[in-house]
Structure formats: structure tokens, C-alpha cells
């Protein structure tokens, strides 16, 4: 099955950290990586779509994106968008895991992809310490950097395990017709679904449907179809 999703970035190290701050907004297509991604939002607000689920983001949120997960950030120009992004090799996570601490599970999305952090300063402090260590060339830099990253990940995992952990809920369209269209698409993913067919099926103008769909979901119909088909194909591969 062909898709237009782009694999972005290559990770030659165990992990890399980026501390970015700008007001440029984002203009990034849906894409995926072969590594895990942690984003700590230190300033700003916007949206983030991960594996077909769209979330509202606010300052203090952590976004946890597993390897191969299709995602896209959505931030408007003019809003200060400060974030720390850490790319992490799945092999590194596996090597550092123990039977009772499987670090890759942090990114499996079972509870959700976005965690609202209460008192995020403690997590930010750990990230700042890691950033400072990576920028230097002091004795034991690699060992200490590895330890700081592991400490950060375990601190996040412990918060995720808290029974009152606040995971963001995906945004669900409220328009009943759009909900019906979403259900129809999911039930016919393996078929050709032209826009005209959807419009006829639901007795709605093609152009009105396209506008309403984007308004309610944040996707174009074509973009949603592509993402759902990619996720479906990935699930079939997992199942063998």
C-alpha cells in the first residue's frame, strides 16, 4: 500500500536532545521516525496528532511518541513555542531495561500519548541537567548523560503509573454526521473511497463535507484516509 508519509531523521547515537524556542509556528506534514521521541512543552499551546488521535497541548505537557508512530505538531505563528525534544534509540531503551522496567513501554501509547504534568519543573530540571551535560566535554560525560536520561525517563514513568495521572483525552468530533463518516471510513479501509462516494453515501455536498470534516477533525479527508490505512497496515504487520 502506498502512502505519502515521510520518514524523517536518522539517529546515529543512543539519543539526541534539542532545545528549541521560536514563534514561527509549524508547517510539518505527517511523518514518522524509527526512534522514540519525547517532547516537553515549556511554553506555548497548540495541537499534536499521534497515530490518528488529535490532542490539545498546553505548557507543561509531555508528548510520548513511539517508533513508527505517525505524528504531526500544529502550532500557530506568533505564539512562543519552547520545547525540549529528545530522540531515543529503541535499542538503547532495550539495553537499559530490566525485567521489571521495560523502558519502551513508556512510548507504547496504551494510556495515551500526552501526559499533563503536575509541577513540571522537576522534569524540566532533569532535562536541563541532561542538556548541560551533553553540551560539555567533561570526564564521564557519556556515562553521566546516560544516567540523567534514564532518571528522566523513570521519573516520567512513575508519574504515568500514578492512578491519578492526567493523560490528555483525544479530541472527538461532536458533529454526528462526521462521526458517521469516520465510522464508515474505518469500516471500508481496504476499499477505494473517493470523495464523491462519501458525499453520496451521506447525502451531503462534497465541498461542504470536506470543509466540515477538516473543521471537526483537523484533517483533510484524504489525509485521514492515508493515516488510517497506514496504521491498519502496521497492525497487520504486527499480527504477522
Where are these regions (language model features)?
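Short, conserved beta-strand element in jelly-roll/cupin
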Residues: 31-48, 64
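Short acidic-glycine-tyrosine-enriched beta hairpin
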Residues: 52-66
